[in-house]
Amino acid sequence: MAPFTFLVGILSLCICCIVLGAAAEPSYAVVEQLRNVPDGWIKHDAAPASELIRFRLAMNQERAAEFERRVIDMSTPGHSSYGQHMKRDDVREFLRPPEEVSDKVLSWLRSENVPAGSIESHGNWVTFTVPVSQAERMLRTRFYAFQHVETSTTQVRTLAYSVPHDVHRYIQMIQPTTRFGQPARHERQPLFHGTVATKEELAANCSTTITPNCLRELYGIYDTRAEPDPRNRLGVSGFLDQYARYDDFENFMRLYATSRTDVNFTVVSINDGLNLQDSSLSSTEASLDVQYAYSLAYKALGTYYTTGGRGPVVPEEGQDTNVSTNEPYLDQLHYLLDLPDEELPAVLSTSYGEDEQSVPESYSNATCNLFAQLGARGVSIIFSSGDSGVGSTCITNDGTKTTRFLPVFPASCPFVTAVGGTHDIQPEKAISFSSGGFSDHFPRPSYQDSSVQGYLEQLGSRWNGLYNPSGRGFPDVAAQATNFVVIDHGQTLRVGGTSASAPVFAAIVSRLNAARLEDGLLKLGFLNPWLYSLNQTGFTDIIDGGSSGCYVGTSNEQLVPNASWNATPGWDPVTGLGTPIYNTLVKLATSVSSTP
């Protein structure tokens, strides 16, 4: 009997070990999952096991809604906290997760042998770097190379990922994983190449060609007595290998902004962003942005923020393995939020975006909150609304291929000021490609309730089911968007797009800040509550024209016949509140008190 007893003991011990081993293996829960490969992408081979990926992990914020309410309050004239912008450390402390939450997440990373030197913790965000093979074990997934059909860009991504149950409730997202979209320039193709007319001819015919002088006349922009102020830095965003060329800038200022020839800009590199001066690549977007932002702003201190992060992220045979992220928004935003308060730009103009549906909702929420954090610190965030009208294809990418108007992100974020487009000058009209509509991710903020509701009442039942009437409406304002003269690689071009509208409006905001600072007032910061409180005073209401979209392929056939948002009296989702009247806006801006 002894051998049998011994055998039973061994079996019992083995079973116990198996049970304990199973208990030691944590159960996992899915954080994010895509039903299928997003439209426009092709799945290729498994990602190289040794490829390094830098991840950004966002923890859920218990006080996010409270914080965003506070940002709106401090930006609303008449509120007791108006103009009381927060300091960097105050924002961090307000949003810092409970210590036990951070400890739990960091403990999980350490238990997965994530190199301690790669872990950086910033409030509710954690960055870490691991090879693909380790990421697959940590996140219970497989990474593959995916190629974009149109651009041939290759990215390492997955369709789903999971984390242990005991940390699942704390994690909002980990990227790059399921986010496939990349920002695109909001720029129409150049209308022609070659040498345009002389400056005198251009100034005499602003209905066909736009220069800084045309815009100054159209929007009543005049010079003020304000001197350059380090508190009023005007920033321009650069992504996707767009290089702001100094020679082109100087030539442009000499030809089209003769009173600004002493103006220049500095360059800040984020995530190894470049600003090559000898590249043969087109830089029309960068040229457009810096040439109009700094020719229209009066003696502004200008900074071009060039951010790296463009693919491909799978190296060719024989190339060095680089750390890949392809998350330029997050890289830029975290860089800016880490800056001391005195080094932040007062205004930041960005002319990039993508279909909102291409952005995971967790990503858009987390990113929008970062924009709100900049607003809390007194930064005015300006985005072009996009160049796809009511939507490019108007087909959802969730596997159902439902017909729907498609909003644009980040323009749809309630904490940015989105700028739509116009054309012509007597009168100005909505331009057909100006993106606008209603967000499917963000509810309508209270500051625009009255304005947007008025439009919806005019619209009635038209387009029911094709949009979200409760969503954040955009754009907020508009400006000219076509026939802009730029100089790129020494060649004079005309270009268009809401890429042009954003730096124009940003320059006007910079001027408003200059006037306020000169009068001893604070920067405007997050603009939208103030803009909507004006009831369109200070804006030309655009009531002619409208947007279009939903085109099938390259033809003029529309998936939704006559798909359009019309420009109407009051706010509309093509031109927002209208185009600026600087002379009125500067008086309004300097009459709103928020003293230091």
Swiss-Prot record:
GO MF terms, alphabetically ordered: endopeptidase activity; metal ion binding; serine-type endopeptidase activity; tripeptidyl-peptidase activity
Q: Where is the active site?
A: E285, D289, S499
Q: State where Ca(2+) binds.
A: D541, I542, G570, D572
Specify the propeptide location in this chain.
17-201
Compartment(s): Secreted, Extracellular space
Sum up the protein's function in the record's words: Secreted tripeptidyl-peptidase which degrades proteins at acidic pHs and is involved in virulence.
Q: What is this protein called?
A: Tripeptidyl-peptidase sed3
Identify the gene encoding this protein.
sed3
